[in-house]
């Protein structure tokens, strides 16, 4: 299952659950008062088809296959030329007359002469009505369709689509996440009946005094739309030997019934057509019955091939427990998943799908029928983790009506007896741990008026809530003259969306009619305002543009090759319908996209490039905002001055420091060689609060050769909310009154140490008088590869006094001592 769920409401099922005939304007009522209607159309495009009975037939002269058939269609007898091989006298057939439209051949019928004989219509095969042979039995595919009517219940001349289950309309509802109760015919019928009852009550004169019924009131209309449970259906049967054990709080209720003498065969045509119109493929009579109950009552059922099952245990899955589902998909479970077992091994993934080993087979003669209530949260978590949604899991996720389980269970057993020759040998085993309840909600007329914007009549409020099956726990003869008097309400079990006062207001508003709400102009002036994060992103773009960068906007989709280049050995997100093979994986680094642009530029001899992108990188569990920029060639061209600034690692680092200064954060650099597409001697991780948030470096020669690049420099920085929501603090240092003292220090140090490490030690151990330290010379002779020469320049100043020579000498001695201690330097 994918996309936004819909529910297809079929007229023939719906009208069985309504107290009154269907309204002609059901489309408008549903759209205005219940939910969006995505489609409203006849079940079948076939028209003017009637039931006829074959009286006799005879061969047409000069034809090998054609017969002239006399057919009684109730009001008259017609003669029809037919070439079917399965004609039988006395059988009832589908007759199309002149003007009939047949969906299967997409044609309107016209009477005509065939072999010189005038034909007054056509005897129809099911395929000509648009039913695929894939879902027909071999007998139904032989020729014209012959009704099976041993009790002569189908009237001649009547609409032939009725016994086929193809008459009436279909209403396709758009189901919002909060209205799981509309995922069944009976759930929609309850809401529609409430709308119809409310429409009728609005026409009557309203009374000022209200007698609120208690929760046992008999006038709550929707309760009459639910078929009644037959308490004697299982009464005379012995107790079942099948034991049920529930070991998890995620299972509220579990019912099973053993049925024997089962005959697995195709379902009757009306049932197959009903499922097809609901978007469900028929399988066999047992599975089709469970699917019919699913769409009619919204209660998922499951049938097991009982085999040697002597016990049912509902438990949490074991860590790393593996299962194979009906569609032969393998899944690995953990202790957060719920399974149905036979006491030893799993036979179903609770609420989602059955397993292959316990599935219904053509040879099955004994089944165990299951009806249960599982925690919506547990089912939703398992479906999301396994990425496996079914029609059953959808209803468990949205919430089923626990009160309907016994009724749906009994209806399924009745259908199995009728359509599968089943024999019920034992009473059902019913195990109920707990019953879900809705919260009690208190609200008053004043709250309703403030939320809706105008006052509603108390009588209307009472009628609408009672019609919707709300229980009103309020003293009798309450007139609500005081607008602050409390109404204590409880929504029916099927309504999982009613949890707070505003949810009740939502029901009252839609029953009033959102299309009738008076428009009101908001008088309060509004002023748009950027958040600190949005401001920083906007200003960061301006900063980079002012530094000479061009902004790029690239696709979030990249090729597998570019993904591996900058995010190797990581789980990735691959889209099902890619634009092309080069656009199939969601990037985890913006550098993947920028290197492609860089390659495009260099192939066209454009080497002086500087561009950036601020966009999202996509990981399995989150999205990260990232800034990436690239440099190549000359960063600054001075033309005739001939003082160009070439792109380099240090230019790139300087730009990054400009960015970090703008953001008000301090970045540290960690030398690394882990990034295979960066030069091993010129790459570093970027750290913020000791967490790696980016990378900077020079492109590897192999990457250059592969993508036709000249020497380039790359940098990427993940912009977390912590970074973007940092308020920049400006530190002011007064202009010094006294002269600055400068000292130089030159020394040899091992090549394994960097200036950054030396600078950190100097900052940590030197008095406040040192205001700046600069590296102004680096030298390494070919003969001393293990040593390098650094020349540092120190700037000393004190705001309160003129520094004496001995003060500066003391600082220099301390600096020298610490450098010898930590790095074993040799003073030159």
Swiss-Prot record:
> Which Pfam families does this UniProt record tie to the protein?
B3_4, B5, FDX-ACB, tRNA_bind, tRNA_synthFbeta
Domain (FDX-ACB): residue spans on this chain: 736-828
Q: Tell me the keywords, alphabetical order.
A: Aminoacyl-tRNA synthetase, ATP-binding, Cytoplasm, Ligase, Magnesium, Metal-binding, Nucleotide-binding, Protein biosynthesis, RNA-binding, tRNA-binding
Primary site of residence: cytoplasm
Report the cofactor remark: Binds 2 magnesium ions per tetramer.
Annotated region Disordered: where? 203-230
Q: Does the keyword tRNA processing apply?
A: no
This protein's superkingdom?
Answer: Bacteria
Q: Which cofactor does it need?
A: Mg(2+)
UniProt entry tagged with the keyword RNA-binding: yes
The UniProt record lists the tRNA-binding domain at 43-161
Among CDD domains, the record links this protein to: PheRS_beta_core, tRNA_bind_bactPheRS
Tell me which EC number(s) this protein carries.
6.1.1.20
- SMART domains according to UniProt: B3_4, B5, FDX-ACB
MF terms from GO for this chain are: ATP binding; magnesium ion binding; phenylalanine-tRNA ligase activity; tRNA binding
What residues bind Mg(2+), as annotated?
Answer: 497, 503, 507
List where in the cell it is found.
Cytoplasm
Family matches, as InterPro entries: aa-tRNA-synth_II/BPL/LPL, B3/B4_tRNA-bd, DNA-bd_dom_put_sf, Fdx_antiC-bd, Fdx_antiC-bd_sf, NA-bd_OB-fold, Phe-tRNA-ligase_IIc_bsu, Phe-tRNA-ligase_IIc_bsu_bact
Gene Ontology cellular component terms for the protein in this record:
phenylalanine-tRNA ligase complex
Gene Ontology process terms (BP): phenylalanyl-tRNA aminoacylation
Where do the TM regions start and end? none
The protein's annotated catalytic reaction(s) are: tRNA(Phe) + L-phenylalanine + ATP = L-phenylalanyl-tRNA(Phe) + AMP + diphosphate + H(+)
Give the UniProt family note.
Belongs to the phenylalanyl-tRNA synthetase beta subunit family. Type 1 subfamily.
Q: PANTHER family under this entry?
A: PHENYLALANINE--TRNA LIGASE BETA SUBUNIT (PTHR10947:SF0), PHENYLALANYL-TRNA SYNTHETASE BETA CHAIN AND LEUCINE-RICH REPEAT-CONTAINING PROTEIN 47 (PTHR10947)
Name of the featured protein: Phenylalanine--tRNA ligase beta subunit
Q: Which organism is it from?
A: Aster yellows witches'-broom phytoplasma (strain AYWB)
Per the record, the gene is pheT
């Amino acid at each position: 299952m994918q996309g936004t769920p819909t529910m297809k409401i079929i007229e023939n099922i719906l009208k069985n659950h309504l107290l009154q005939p269907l309204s002609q304007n059901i489309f408008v009522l549903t759209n205005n008062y219940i939910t969006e209607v995505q489609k409203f159309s006849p079940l079948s495009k076939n028209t003017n088809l009637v039931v006829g009975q074959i009286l006799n037939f005879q061969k047409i002269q000069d034809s090998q296959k054609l017969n002239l058939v006399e057919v009684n269609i109730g009001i008259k007898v017609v003669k029809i030329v037919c070439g079917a091989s399965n004609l039988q006298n006395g059988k009832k057939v589908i007759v199309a007359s002149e003007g009939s439209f047949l969906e299967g051949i997409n044609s309107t019928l016209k009477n005509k002469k065939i072999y010189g004989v005038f034909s007054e219509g056509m005897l129809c095969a099911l395929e000509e009505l648009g039913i695929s042979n894939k879902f027909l039995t071999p007998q139904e595919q032989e020729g014209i369709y012959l009704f099976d009517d041993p009790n002569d219940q189908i009237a001649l001349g009547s609409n032939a689509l009725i016994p086929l289950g193809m008459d009436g309309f279909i209403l396709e509802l758009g189901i919002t996440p909060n209205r799981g109760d509309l995922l069944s015919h009976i759930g929609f019928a309850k809401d529609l009946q409430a709308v119809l009852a409310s429409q009728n009550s609005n026409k009557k004169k309203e009374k000022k005094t209200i007698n609120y019924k208690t929760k046992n009131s008999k006038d709550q209309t929707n309760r009459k739309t639910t078929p009644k449970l037959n308490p004697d259906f299982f009464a005379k049967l012995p107790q079942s030997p099948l034991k049920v054990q529930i070991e998890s709080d995620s299972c509220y209720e579990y019912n099973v019934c053993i049925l024997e003498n089962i005959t697995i065969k195709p379902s009757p045509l009306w049932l197959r057509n009903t499922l097809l119109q609901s978007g469900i493929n028929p399988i066999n009579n047992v599975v089709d019955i469970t699917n019919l109950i699913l769409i009619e009552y919204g209660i998922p059922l499951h049938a097991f091939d009982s085999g040697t099952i002597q016990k049912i245990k509902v438990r949490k899955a074991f860590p790393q427990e593996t299962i194979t589902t009906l569609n032969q998909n393998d899944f690995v479970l953990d202790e957060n998943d719920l399974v149905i077992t036979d006491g030893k091994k799993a036979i179903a993934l609770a609420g989602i799908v059955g397993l292959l080993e316990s599935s219904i087979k053509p040879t099955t003669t004994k089944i165990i029928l299951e009806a249960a209530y599982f925690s919506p949260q547990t089912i939703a978590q398992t479906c999301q983790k396994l990425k496996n949604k079914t029609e059953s899991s959808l209803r468990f996720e949205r919430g089923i009506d626990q009160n309907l389980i016994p009724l749906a269970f009994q209806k399924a057993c009745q259908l199995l007896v009728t359509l599968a020759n089943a024999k019920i040998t034992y009473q059902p085993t019913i195990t109920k741990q707990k019953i879900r309840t809705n919260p009690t909600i208190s609200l008053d007329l004043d709250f309703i008026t403030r939320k809706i914007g105008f006052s509603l009549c108390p009588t209307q409020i009472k009628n609408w809530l009672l019609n919707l099956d709300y229980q009103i726990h309020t003293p009798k003869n309450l007139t609500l003259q005081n607008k602050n008097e409390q109404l204590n309400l409880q929504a029916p079990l099927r309504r999982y969306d009613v949890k707070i006062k505003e949810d009740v207001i939502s029901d009252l508003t839609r029953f009033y009619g959102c299309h009738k709400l008076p428009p009101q102009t908001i008088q309060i002036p509004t002023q748009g305002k950027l958040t600190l994060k949005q401001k920083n992103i906007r200003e960061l773009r301006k900063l980079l543009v002012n530094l000479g960068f061009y902004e790029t906007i690239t696709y979030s989709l990249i090729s597998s090759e570019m993904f591996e280049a900058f995010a190797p050995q990581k789980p990735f997100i691959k889209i099902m319908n890619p634009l092309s093979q080069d656009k199939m994986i969601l990037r985890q680094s913006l550098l993947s996209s920028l290197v492609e642009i860089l390659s495009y530029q260099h192939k066209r001899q454009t080497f002086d490039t500087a561009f950036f992108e601020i966009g999202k990188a996509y990981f399995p569990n989150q999205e990260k905002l990232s800034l990436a920029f690239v440099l190549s060639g000359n960063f600054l061209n001075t033309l005739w001055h001939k003082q160009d600034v070439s792109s380099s690692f240090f230019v790139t680092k300087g730009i990054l420091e400009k960015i970090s200064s703008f953001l008000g954060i301090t970045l540290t650099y960690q030398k690394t060689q882990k990034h295979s597409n960066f030069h091993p001697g010129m790459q570093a991780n970027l750290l913020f609060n000791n967490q790696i948030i980016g990378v900077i470096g020079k492109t590897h020669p192999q990457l250059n050769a592969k993508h036709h690049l000249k020497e380039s420099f790359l940098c990427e920085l993940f912009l977390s909310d912590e970074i973007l929501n940092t308020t920049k603090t400006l530190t002011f240092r007064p202009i010094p009154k006294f002269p600055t003292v400068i000292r130089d220090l030159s020394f040899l140090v091992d090549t394994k140490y960097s200036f950054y490490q030396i600078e950190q030690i100097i900052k940590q151990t030197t008095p406040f008088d040192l205001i700046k330290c600069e590296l102004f010379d680096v030298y390494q002779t070919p003969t001393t590869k293990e040593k390098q020469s650094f020349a540092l320049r120190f700037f000393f100043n004190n705001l309160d006094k003129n520094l004496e020579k001995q003060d500066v000498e003391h600082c220099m001695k301390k600096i020298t001592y610490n450098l010898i201690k930590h790095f074993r330097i040799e003073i030159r």
